[in-house]
Amino acid sequence: MGMDIHLQAGELAGWLNDAALPLWRQKGFDGEGGGFVETIDMKGEPTRDDRRSRVQPRQVYCFAAAGRRGWDGDWRTAAEGGLLYFDRVYGQPGGFYGALANADGKLIDASFDLYNQAFALLAFAHLAEVLPERGAEMVGRSDKLRRQLEARCKHPLAGFEEDDPPRLPLGSNPHMHLFEACLASEEVEGFDRVAWANLADEIAHLAMDRFIDAESGALREFFDHDWAPFPGEKGRIVEPGHLFEWAWLLLRWAERRGNAQAIVKARRLFEIGEKDGTCPDRDVVVMTLFDDFSVADPTARLWPQTEWLKAAIRFAALTEGAERERYLASAGRAAAALQRFLNVPVRGLWRDKQKADGSFVEEPAPASTFYHILCAIYELEDCLKRM
Protein backbone atom coordinates (compact mmCIF):
# COMPACT_ATOMS: atom_id res chain seq x y z
CA MET A 1 0.00 0.00 0.00
CA GLY A 2 2.90 2.34 0.78
CA MET A 3 3.85 2.52 -2.88
CA ASP A 4 0.30 3.30 -3.97
CA ILE A 5 0.17 6.39 -1.80
CA HIS A 6 3.33 7.75 -3.47
CA LEU A 7 1.69 7.28 -6.87
CA GLN A 8 -1.50 8.94 -5.63
CA ALA A 9 0.52 11.84 -4.22
CA GLY A 10 2.21 12.31 -7.60
CA GLU A 11 -1.11 12.27 -9.44
CA LEU A 12 -2.66 14.75 -7.02
CA ALA A 13 0.34 17.10 -7.24
CA GLY A 14 0.15 17.00 -11.04
CA TRP A 15 -3.57 17.74 -10.94
CA LEU A 16 -2.97 20.68 -8.58
CA ASN A 17 -0.03 22.30 -10.36
CA ASP A 18 -0.97 21.62 -13.98
CA ALA A 19 -4.76 21.94 -13.87
CA ALA A 20 -6.37 23.29 -10.69
CA LEU A 21 -4.09 26.22 -9.86
CA PRO A 22 -4.00 27.52 -13.48
CA LEU A 23 -7.79 27.16 -13.86
CA TRP A 24 -8.67 28.83 -10.56
CA ARG A 25 -6.12 31.57 -11.24
CA GLN A 26 -7.46 32.27 -14.74
CA LYS A 27 -11.21 31.74 -14.23
CA GLY A 28 -11.56 31.86 -10.44
CA PHE A 29 -9.97 35.27 -9.91
CA ASP A 30 -12.01 38.18 -11.26
CA GLY A 31 -9.39 40.31 -13.00
CA GLU A 32 -11.85 43.13 -13.71
CA GLY A 33 -13.97 43.54 -10.59
CA GLY A 34 -11.43 41.96 -8.26
CA GLY A 35 -11.77 39.12 -5.82
CA PHE A 36 -12.46 35.43 -6.19
CA VAL A 37 -15.63 33.95 -7.68
CA GLU A 38 -17.86 31.73 -5.55
CA THR A 39 -18.15 28.90 -8.09
CA ILE A 40 -16.98 27.76 -11.53
CA ASP A 41 -19.49 25.81 -13.64
CA MET A 42 -18.76 22.37 -15.06
CA LYS A 43 -17.85 23.89 -18.44
CA GLY A 44 -15.04 25.78 -16.71
CA GLU A 45 -16.66 29.24 -16.66
CA PRO A 46 -17.08 31.49 -13.58
CA THR A 47 -20.62 32.06 -12.30
CA ARG A 48 -22.20 35.21 -10.88
CA ASP A 49 -23.19 33.53 -7.62
CA ASP A 50 -23.08 35.65 -4.46
CA ARG A 51 -19.65 35.50 -2.82
CA ARG A 52 -19.30 34.34 0.75
CA SER A 53 -16.73 36.27 2.75
CA ARG A 54 -14.77 33.13 3.74
CA VAL A 55 -13.97 32.30 0.11
CA GLN A 56 -11.73 35.36 -0.25
CA PRO A 57 -9.16 34.64 2.53
CA ARG A 58 -9.32 30.90 1.79
CA GLN A 59 -8.28 31.54 -1.82
CA VAL A 60 -5.65 34.04 -0.65
CA TYR A 61 -4.27 31.20 1.48
CA CYS A 62 -4.26 28.83 -1.51
CA PHE A 63 -2.30 31.14 -3.80
CA ALA A 64 0.08 32.29 -1.04
CA ALA A 65 0.80 28.65 -0.12
CA ALA A 66 1.24 27.74 -3.80
CA GLY A 67 3.71 30.61 -4.19
CA ARG A 68 5.65 29.43 -1.20
CA ARG A 69 5.82 25.92 -2.67
CA GLY A 70 7.24 27.27 -5.92
CA TRP A 71 4.22 27.12 -8.23
CA ASP A 72 5.31 29.05 -11.32
CA GLY A 73 1.99 30.72 -12.14
CA ASP A 74 1.02 34.27 -11.15
CA TRP A 75 0.05 33.52 -7.57
CA ARG A 76 0.97 36.96 -6.29
CA THR A 77 -1.65 39.00 -8.19
CA ALA A 78 -4.35 36.63 -6.96
CA ALA A 79 -3.15 36.54 -3.34
CA GLU A 80 -2.66 40.30 -2.99
CA GLY A 81 -5.65 41.22 -5.15
CA GLY A 82 -7.86 38.84 -3.20
CA LEU A 83 -6.91 40.44 0.10
CA LEU A 84 -7.43 43.93 -1.31
CA TYR A 85 -10.93 42.96 -2.46
CA PHE A 86 -11.68 41.25 0.87
CA ASP A 87 -10.76 44.47 2.71
CA ARG A 88 -12.62 46.77 0.33
CA VAL A 89 -15.82 44.76 -0.02
CA TYR A 90 -16.24 43.00 3.33
CA GLY A 91 -14.25 45.19 5.72
CA GLN A 92 -16.37 46.92 8.36
CA PRO A 93 -15.67 50.18 10.24
CA GLY A 94 -15.22 48.21 13.50
CA GLY A 95 -12.40 46.14 11.99
CA PHE A 96 -14.33 42.92 11.38
CA TYR A 97 -15.45 41.39 8.08
CA GLY A 98 -19.02 41.01 6.81
CA ALA A 99 -20.54 37.77 5.52
CA LEU A 100 -21.77 38.00 1.91
CA ALA A 101 -21.45 40.15 -1.22
CA ASN A 102 -22.91 39.90 -4.70
CA ALA A 103 -20.81 39.32 -7.83
CA ASP A 104 -20.58 43.10 -8.38
CA GLY A 105 -18.79 43.52 -5.05
CA LYS A 106 -21.72 45.00 -3.13
CA LEU A 107 -21.98 43.81 0.48
CA ILE A 108 -25.43 42.29 1.03
CA ASP A 109 -24.92 40.78 4.49
CA ALA A 110 -22.65 42.68 6.89
CA SER A 111 -23.26 40.35 9.85
CA PHE A 112 -20.43 39.16 12.10
CA ASP A 113 -19.37 35.51 12.00
CA LEU A 114 -16.40 34.31 14.07
CA TYR A 115 -15.68 31.74 11.36
CA ASN A 116 -14.99 34.42 8.74
CA GLN A 117 -12.63 36.32 11.03
CA ALA A 118 -10.62 33.11 11.61
CA PHE A 119 -9.92 32.82 7.89
CA ALA A 120 -8.74 36.43 7.74
CA LEU A 121 -6.16 35.50 10.41
CA LEU A 122 -5.09 32.43 8.41
CA ALA A 123 -4.61 34.55 5.28
CA PHE A 124 -2.53 37.16 7.15
CA ALA A 125 -0.15 34.46 8.42
CA HIS A 126 0.35 32.85 5.02
CA LEU A 127 0.83 36.16 3.22
CA ALA A 128 3.46 37.16 5.78
CA GLU A 129 5.30 33.88 5.11
CA VAL A 130 5.47 34.34 1.35
CA LEU A 131 5.77 38.15 1.18
CA PRO A 132 8.28 39.13 3.90
CA GLU A 133 8.11 42.77 2.78
CA ARG A 134 4.48 42.81 3.98
CA GLY A 135 5.33 40.95 7.19
CA ALA A 136 5.17 43.95 9.53
CA GLU A 137 1.79 44.98 8.08
CA MET A 138 0.42 41.44 8.55
CA VAL A 139 1.73 41.27 12.13
CA GLY A 140 -0.09 44.51 12.93
CA ARG A 141 -3.34 43.47 11.26
CA SER A 142 -3.26 40.05 12.84
CA ASP A 143 -2.66 41.39 16.36
CA LYS A 144 -5.35 44.01 15.94
CA LEU A 145 -7.97 41.51 14.78
CA ARG A 146 -7.11 39.06 17.57
CA ARG A 147 -7.42 41.78 20.20
CA GLN A 148 -10.71 42.97 18.71
CA LEU A 149 -12.10 39.43 18.78
CA GLU A 150 -11.05 39.04 22.40
CA ALA A 151 -12.68 42.38 23.26
CA ARG A 152 -15.90 41.63 21.38
CA CYS A 153 -16.68 38.03 22.12
CA LYS A 154 -14.31 36.33 24.56
CA HIS A 155 -16.24 33.67 26.48
CA PRO A 156 -16.03 34.00 30.31
CA LEU A 157 -14.90 30.35 30.73
CA ALA A 158 -12.78 29.69 27.62
CA GLY A 159 -12.91 30.25 23.89
CA PHE A 160 -15.32 32.65 22.21
CA GLU A 161 -18.96 33.60 22.05
CA GLU A 162 -20.68 33.47 18.67
CA ASP A 163 -21.21 37.25 18.84
CA ASP A 164 -21.85 40.23 21.10
CA PRO A 165 -24.50 40.13 22.53
CA PRO A 166 -24.02 36.35 22.98
CA ARG A 167 -26.22 34.00 20.99
CA LEU A 168 -26.70 30.24 21.21
CA PRO A 169 -25.76 27.61 20.36
CA LEU A 170 -22.02 28.07 20.76
CA GLY A 171 -20.03 26.19 18.12
CA SER A 172 -16.86 24.13 18.10
CA ASN A 173 -16.28 24.77 14.40
CA PRO A 174 -15.26 28.46 14.50
CA HIS A 175 -12.78 27.46 17.23
CA MET A 176 -11.33 24.81 14.96
CA HIS A 177 -10.51 27.42 12.33
CA LEU A 178 -9.19 29.84 14.96
CA PHE A 179 -7.00 26.99 16.24
CA GLU A 180 -5.69 26.47 12.71
CA ALA A 181 -4.96 30.21 12.39
CA CYS A 182 -3.13 30.19 15.75
CA LEU A 183 -0.96 27.25 14.72
CA ALA A 184 -0.03 29.07 11.51
CA SER A 185 0.56 32.43 13.24
CA GLU A 186 2.79 31.13 16.06
CA GLU A 187 5.28 29.89 13.45
CA VAL A 188 5.62 33.13 11.47
CA GLU A 189 8.69 35.30 11.98
CA GLY A 190 7.73 38.56 13.72
CA PHE A 191 4.27 37.45 14.87
CA ASP A 192 3.44 37.59 18.59
CA ARG A 193 4.30 33.95 19.18
CA VAL A 194 3.43 34.01 22.88
CA ALA A 195 -0.06 35.42 22.29
CA TRP A 196 -0.80 32.99 19.46
CA ALA A 197 0.60 30.00 21.35
CA ASN A 198 -1.46 30.90 24.43
CA LEU A 199 -4.65 31.11 22.38
CA ALA A 200 -3.82 27.83 20.62
CA ASP A 201 -3.31 26.16 24.01
CA GLU A 202 -6.59 27.54 25.33
CA ILE A 203 -8.52 26.20 22.33
CA ALA A 204 -6.74 22.81 22.47
CA HIS A 205 -7.70 22.39 26.13
CA LEU A 206 -11.28 23.58 25.50
CA ALA A 207 -11.55 20.96 22.76
CA MET A 208 -10.14 18.19 24.95
CA ASP A 209 -12.18 19.17 28.03
CA ARG A 210 -15.51 20.27 26.51
CA PHE A 211 -15.90 19.70 22.76
CA ILE A 212 -14.83 16.05 23.02
CA ASP A 213 -17.19 13.81 25.00
CA ALA A 214 -15.28 12.26 27.92
CA GLU A 215 -17.01 8.89 27.50
CA SER A 216 -17.37 8.31 23.76
CA GLY A 217 -14.39 10.35 22.58
CA ALA A 218 -16.47 12.01 19.83
CA LEU A 219 -16.46 15.76 19.24
CA ARG A 220 -19.75 17.63 19.22
CA GLU A 221 -20.66 20.68 17.14
CA PHE A 222 -23.11 22.67 19.30
CA PHE A 223 -23.05 23.79 22.93
CA ASP A 224 -24.95 25.65 25.62
CA HIS A 225 -23.46 28.75 27.21
CA ASP A 226 -21.56 26.73 29.83
CA TRP A 227 -20.00 24.51 27.10
CA ALA A 228 -22.32 21.60 27.93
CA PRO A 229 -23.86 19.86 24.88
CA PHE A 230 -26.73 21.92 23.43
CA PRO A 231 -30.16 20.48 24.36
CA GLY A 232 -32.10 18.43 21.82
CA GLU A 233 -31.05 16.96 18.50
CA LYS A 234 -28.67 19.79 17.64
CA GLY A 235 -26.45 18.95 20.60
CA ARG A 236 -26.13 15.36 19.36
CA ILE A 237 -24.61 16.29 15.99
CA VAL A 238 -21.17 14.85 15.18
CA GLU A 239 -19.46 15.57 11.83
CA PRO A 240 -16.91 12.93 10.77
CA GLY A 241 -15.09 15.47 8.58
CA HIS A 242 -14.53 17.61 11.66
CA LEU A 243 -13.39 14.60 13.71
CA PHE A 244 -10.60 14.12 11.18
CA GLU A 245 -9.86 17.85 10.96
CA TRP A 246 -9.61 18.21 14.75
CA ALA A 247 -7.47 15.06 14.92
CA TRP A 248 -5.05 16.60 12.41
CA LEU A 249 -4.89 19.91 14.26
CA LEU A 250 -4.48 18.28 17.68
CA LEU A 251 -1.65 16.12 16.31
CA ARG A 252 0.16 19.21 15.04
CA TRP A 253 -0.32 20.93 18.40
CA ALA A 254 0.67 17.81 20.38
CA GLU A 255 3.89 17.42 18.42
CA ARG A 256 4.91 21.02 19.13
CA ARG A 257 3.97 20.90 22.81
CA GLY A 258 4.88 17.31 23.64
CA ASN A 259 1.32 16.67 24.80
CA ALA A 260 0.52 12.95 24.97
CA GLN A 261 -3.14 13.45 25.97
CA ALA A 262 -3.87 15.23 22.69
CA ILE A 263 -2.50 12.28 20.70
CA VAL A 264 -4.79 9.89 22.60
CA LYS A 265 -7.80 12.15 21.93
CA ALA A 266 -6.84 12.54 18.26
CA ARG A 267 -6.44 8.79 17.81
CA ARG A 268 -9.96 8.22 19.12
CA LEU A 269 -11.41 10.97 16.89
CA PHE A 270 -9.75 9.29 13.91
CA GLU A 271 -11.04 5.86 14.92
CA ILE A 272 -14.66 7.08 15.11
CA GLY A 273 -14.32 8.95 11.82
CA GLU A 274 -12.93 5.92 10.02
CA LYS A 275 -15.12 3.24 11.62
CA ASP A 276 -18.46 5.01 11.96
CA GLY A 277 -18.08 8.03 9.69
CA THR A 278 -17.34 6.25 6.42
CA CYS A 279 -19.95 4.53 4.27
CA PRO A 280 -18.85 0.91 3.73
CA ASP A 281 -20.46 0.70 0.27
CA ARG A 282 -18.98 3.89 -1.19
CA ASP A 283 -15.82 4.10 0.98
CA VAL A 284 -16.35 7.83 1.52
CA VAL A 285 -16.76 9.96 4.64
CA VAL A 286 -20.41 10.90 5.20
CA MET A 287 -21.65 14.29 6.33
CA THR A 288 -23.28 13.80 9.75
CA LEU A 289 -23.70 11.32 12.60
CA PHE A 290 -25.59 11.51 15.89
CA ASP A 291 -23.72 11.05 19.17
CA ASP A 292 -24.63 7.32 19.19
CA PHE A 293 -22.72 7.13 15.85
CA SER A 294 -25.83 6.38 13.80
CA VAL A 295 -25.86 8.16 10.43
CA ALA A 296 -27.86 11.39 10.37
CA ASP A 297 -26.96 12.45 6.80
CA PRO A 298 -25.43 9.93 4.36
CA THR A 299 -24.50 12.61 1.81
CA ALA A 300 -20.75 12.64 1.19
CA ARG A 301 -19.15 16.01 0.46
CA LEU A 302 -15.68 16.43 -0.97
CA TRP A 303 -14.07 18.29 1.93
CA PRO A 304 -14.29 15.52 4.58
CA GLN A 305 -12.31 13.22 2.26
CA THR A 306 -9.42 15.71 2.37
CA GLU A 307 -9.53 15.84 6.17
CA TRP A 308 -9.47 12.04 6.35
CA LEU A 309 -6.37 12.11 4.14
CA LYS A 310 -4.62 14.82 6.21
CA ALA A 311 -5.21 13.02 9.52
CA ALA A 312 -4.29 9.57 8.17
CA ILE A 313 -1.03 10.68 6.58
CA ARG A 314 0.05 12.67 9.65
CA PHE A 315 -0.65 9.67 11.89
CA ALA A 316 1.40 7.55 9.47
CA ALA A 317 4.31 9.99 9.77
CA LEU A 318 4.17 9.87 13.59
CA THR A 319 3.95 6.07 13.90
CA GLU A 320 5.99 3.11 12.66
CA GLY A 321 5.77 -0.55 11.75
CA ALA A 322 2.34 -2.17 11.46
CA GLU A 323 0.62 0.92 12.86
CA ARG A 324 2.16 3.11 10.16
CA GLU A 325 1.06 0.62 7.48
CA ARG A 326 -2.52 0.78 8.79
CA TYR A 327 -2.54 4.58 8.58
CA LEU A 328 -0.93 4.50 5.12
CA ALA A 329 -3.67 2.14 3.94
CA SER A 330 -6.27 4.51 5.36
CA ALA A 331 -4.61 7.46 3.62
CA GLY A 332 -4.72 5.51 0.35
CA ARG A 333 -8.47 4.98 0.75
CA ALA A 334 -8.94 8.68 1.52
CA ALA A 335 -6.90 9.72 -1.53
CA ALA A 336 -8.96 7.36 -3.71
CA ALA A 337 -12.18 8.86 -2.30
CA LEU A 338 -10.89 12.36 -3.03
CA GLN A 339 -9.90 11.41 -6.58
CA ARG A 340 -13.44 10.23 -7.35
CA PHE A 341 -14.69 13.76 -6.62
CA LEU A 342 -11.97 15.26 -8.86
CA ASN A 343 -12.90 13.05 -11.81
CA VAL A 344 -14.83 15.59 -13.90
CA PRO A 345 -14.70 16.55 -17.63
CA VAL A 346 -12.81 19.83 -17.05
CA ARG A 347 -9.61 18.89 -15.21
CA GLY A 348 -9.05 21.14 -12.20
CA LEU A 349 -12.70 21.29 -11.11
CA TRP A 350 -14.50 18.97 -8.67
CA ARG A 351 -17.84 17.62 -7.52
CA ASP A 352 -18.99 18.79 -4.11
CA LYS A 353 -21.70 16.28 -3.10
CA GLN A 354 -22.24 12.56 -3.58
CA LYS A 355 -25.72 11.25 -2.79
CA ALA A 356 -26.36 8.07 -0.81
CA ASP A 357 -26.91 6.15 -4.09
CA GLY A 358 -23.39 7.03 -5.26
CA SER A 359 -24.43 9.60 -7.89
CA PHE A 360 -23.02 13.13 -7.78
CA VAL A 361 -25.08 16.32 -7.59
CA GLU A 362 -24.82 18.31 -10.83
CA GLU A 363 -23.75 21.81 -9.82
CA PRO A 364 -20.86 24.26 -10.21
CA ALA A 365 -17.61 23.62 -8.31
CA PRO A 366 -17.42 25.71 -5.10
CA ALA A 367 -14.22 27.73 -4.65
CA SER A 368 -14.42 27.23 -0.87
CA THR A 369 -13.32 23.59 -1.28
CA PHE A 370 -9.95 24.48 -2.85
CA TYR A 371 -8.44 25.30 0.55
CA HIS A 372 -9.21 21.77 1.77
CA ILE A 373 -7.84 20.07 -1.35
CA LEU A 374 -4.64 22.10 -1.66
CA CYS A 375 -3.86 21.75 2.04
CA ALA A 376 -4.37 17.96 1.86
CA ILE A 377 -2.09 17.58 -1.17
CA TYR A 378 0.69 19.60 0.49
CA GLU A 379 0.26 17.73 3.78
CA LEU A 380 0.49 14.42 1.91
CA GLU A 381 3.77 15.52 0.26
CA ASP A 382 5.24 16.81 3.53
CA CYS A 383 4.34 13.76 5.60
CA LEU A 384 5.62 11.31 2.98
CA LYS A 385 8.98 13.14 3.07
CA ARG A 386 9.17 12.50 6.83
CA MET A 387 8.89 8.72 6.46
Swiss-Prot record:
It catalyses: D-mannose 6-phosphate = D-fructose 6-phosphate. CDD domains: AGE (cd00249). InterPro entries: 6-hairpin_glycosidase_sf, 6hp_glycosidase-like_sf, AGE/CE, AGE_dom. The keyword Isomerase applies. GO terms for biological process: carbohydrate metabolic process. Keywords: Isomerase. Its EC number is 5.3.1.8. One of its GO terms (molecular function) is mannose-6-phosphate isomerase activity. It is an enzyme of class 5 (isomerase). Belongs to the N-acylglucosamine 2-epimerase family. This is Mannose-6-phosphate isomerase. The gene is pmi.
